[in-house]
C-alpha cells in the first residue's frame, strides 16, 4: 500500500489522563488506522514531536525547522506522504514547505494528507472530491493507483 508516515503530533494523544485512548510513548492507533485503510505505516523519528504549533506566528523560523525535522525523518524512512489529524499541523507541514525547501536544500518536498482524505479514498470517494487542489505540495498523483489504498479482508 501507499507508504504513509503517521503524525500524531503533540496533541492527538495528550493529555493522557483525560484521553487515555493509546499509549502516549508508543502509540499504535494511527498506525492501525493507516493499515485499516490499506496504507503501509512508516515508522520514523519525531512522529510525536511538536510541528511548531502556534509559534508559527511569533517564531516562524522555529516552526519551519521543527516541521522540516519531522518531514525529513519521514521521507528518509521511505514515506510517500505524511498523514495528520490537526489543521495547524497541516498548515505548518504543507503550507510551509516553500520556506522549508528554501532553508533546507536537501529537502525536495513531501505531500501532507489529512487522515480523512485517506479514509474517504479507501471508502471509494473519487480523488477529485478529496480537496487535493488545496495542498501546497501536490498529492493527487498518490491517488492514481487505487490498489495502493484498497482495503483487503
Task: Locate each region found by the language model.
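Iron-sulfur cluster-binding electron-transfer modules in prokaryotic oxidoreductases
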Residues: 1-153
Amino acid at each position: 500500500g501507499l507508504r504513509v508516515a503517521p503524525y500524531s503530533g503533540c496533541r492527538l494523544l495528550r493529555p493522557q489522563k483525560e484521553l487515555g485512548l493509546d499509549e502516549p510513548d508508543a502509540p499504535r492507533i494511527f498506525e492501525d488506522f493507516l493499515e485499516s485503510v490499506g496504507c503501509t505505516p512508516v515508522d520514523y523519528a519525531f512522529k510525536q514531536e511538536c510541528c511548531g504549533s502556534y509559534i508559527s506566528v511569533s517564531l516562524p523560523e522555529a516552526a519551519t525547522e521543527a516541521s522540516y525535522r519531522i518531514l525529513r525523518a519521514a521521507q528518509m524512512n521511505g514515506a510517500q506522504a505524511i498523514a495528520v489529524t490537526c489543521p495547524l499541523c497541516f498548515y505548518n507541514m504543507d503550507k510551509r514547505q516553500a520556506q522549508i525547501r528554501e532553508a533546507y536544500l536537501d529537502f525536495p518536498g513531501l505531500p501532507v494528507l489529512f487522515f480523512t482524505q485517506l479514509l474517504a479514498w479507501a471508502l471509494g470517494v473519487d480523488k477529485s472530491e478529496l480537496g487535493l487542489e488545496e495542498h501546497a505540495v501536490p498529492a493527487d498523483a498518490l491517488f492514481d493507483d487505487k490498489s495502493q489504498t484498497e482495503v483487503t479482508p
